[in-house]
A protein has these predicted regions:
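N-terminal small-domain helix-loop-helix segment of the aminotransferase-like
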Residues: 2-101, 108, 158, 284-286
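Helix C-cap/helix->beta junction micro-motif
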Residues: 26-29, 137, 197-198, 312, ...
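Conserved PLP-anchoring active-site segment centered on the Schiff-base-forming lysine
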Residues: 112-134
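A short helix-loop-beta submotif of the ANL/AMP-binding
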Residues: 135-141
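Active-site phosphate-binding strand-loop segment of PLP-dependent enzymes
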Residues: 146-215
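Conserved core segment of the aminotransferase class I/II
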Residues: 224, 228-299, 303, 307-308, ...
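Conserved glycine-rich beta-strand-loop-beta hairpin in the small C-terminal domain of fold type I
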Residues: 281, 297-306, 316-328, 360
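PLP-dependent enzyme catalytic core of the Aspartate aminotransferase-like
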Residues: 331-332, 341-351, 356-385
Length: 385
């Protein structure tokens, strides 16, 4: 009786929902499932952030509509954090926009700039909302292969001239989900020059900048000369402070791009619960030792998993950022089938690489969001299949 729009029909099933369904079904059957699939931190939000929410929630003024552009205190806290972390000065009134998690901002941004037939240049494999947001805006996603032989960086010179002329946005994400690859200044300089020459907006997803190891410190594209003219950067409190369920992030960078996204959002949502924004101020302005301890915890888990994978003969790159390990499928089968084998025979959930795009075929992603004891148990199970 009712027919879905073509845009919705063009959207692939959301990978993580499909994985969650399979996981819940297995657990309902009484199976002991080790979930290495979805990247949802297993540790609690720091106590001082929860207390800030608790206190702010008691204030009746916070029960009303929030300001569309976010609390001034939160925008100022983000500006201070960016200055301290990256040495980047931002105007809190025009160059920062709080979001209901960075995901919604990333997905809504194409609505501001894509017309039918316009392209977004989307990493493949990549975070699904880049492609989904493009399709829902009426644009066309053009896949940029991220290949191991090129360190999982897009080869900008290989993008056809005809595509460049129709492209309005390029999405990049380093440290990368799902590959855990990183990018350095040389790549960002090339990207900025490419964007300026072709009049393309850079959307940089920096959600994993604070999850890093072995002395590595990820960059912000806004550190580089000329970036602010063509770039908008998205960040989130989800991974840094274990706040995935709180839904709080932001966009920062070019003031005109911020204003365009703000206009889209003003027609779609009514802002972020003010108490959550106050908690965000506490997160960014409070003690940061917790972040270091979380990175140390993930590092130990990474080392445990990498050691076990090496013993199994599975090929994986040792990540120096994010809490993901990108692993070559060790048998002659596709990633979905292999993930199914791990679920059925070992009660282990992993994410098939093809769920992030066709160039993710041949890989699976494991997340470091379970205890080291559970990782060891998973490795023991893998030995038996």
């Amino acid at each position: 009786m009712f027919k879905l729009s073509k845009k919705l029909q063009d959207l692939p099933p959301y990978l993580f929902l499909e994985i969650d369904k399979a996981k819940r079904k297995a657990r309902a059957a009484g199976r002991d499932i080790i979930d290495l699939g979805i990247g949802d931190p297993d540790q609690p939000t720091p106590r001082h952030i929860i207390e800030a929410l608790d206190q702010a929630a008691l204030d009746p003024l916070n029960h009303r509509y929030a300001l569309d552009q976010g609390l001034p205190a939160l925008r100022r806290a983000i500006a201070v954090w960016y200055q301290d972390r990256f040495g980047v000065g931002l105007n809190p009134d025009s160059e920062i926009l709080p979001l209901i998690g960075s995901k919604e901002g990333l997905a809504h941004f194409p609505l501001a700039f894509l017309n039918p037939g316009d392209y977004s240049l989307v990493p493949d494999p990549g975070y699904p909302p880049y492609k989904g947001g493009t399709i829902l805006a009426g644009g066309k996603p053009y896949s940029l292969p991220l290949r191991e032989e090129n360190s999982f960086l897009p080869e900008l010179k290989k993008i056809p001239l005809g595509v460049r002329k129709k492209a309005k946005i390029i999405f990049v994400n380093y440290p990368n989900n799902p590959t855990s690859a990183t990018a350095e200044k040389a790549f960002y300089k090339e990207l900025i020059a490419f964007a300026r020459k072709n009049k393309i907006i850079i959307v940089s997803d920096l959600a994993y900048s604070e999850i890093s190891y072995d002395g590595y410190r990820p960059l912000s594209i806004l550190e580089l000369e000329g970036a602010r003219e063509v770039s908008l950067e998205f960040h989130s409190l989800s991974k840094t402070y274990n706040m995935t369920g709180w839904r709080l992030g932001w966009a920062s960078g070019n003031a005109k791009l911020i204003a365009a996204l703000a206009k889209v959002k003003s027609n779609i949502d009514s802002g972020i619960f003010s108490a959550v924004q106050s908690a965000g101020v506490a997160a960014l302005s409070g003690p940061q030792e917790y972040v270091k301890s979380m990175c140390n915890l993930y590092r130990k888990r990474r080392d445990c998993l990498m050691e076990g994978l090496d013993l199994l003969g599975w090929k994986a790159h040792r990540p120096k950022a994010t809490f993901y390990v990108w692993i070559k499928v060790p048998k002659a089968t596709n990633s979905i089938k292999f993930a199914g084998v791990l679920l059925e025979k070992a009660n282990i959930v992993v994410t098939p690489g093809v769920g992030f795009g066709r160039c993710g075929e041949g890989y699976i992603r494991m997340a470091l969001t379970v205890s080291k004891e559970r990782i060891r148990e998973a490795l023991e199970r893998l030995k038996k299949i």
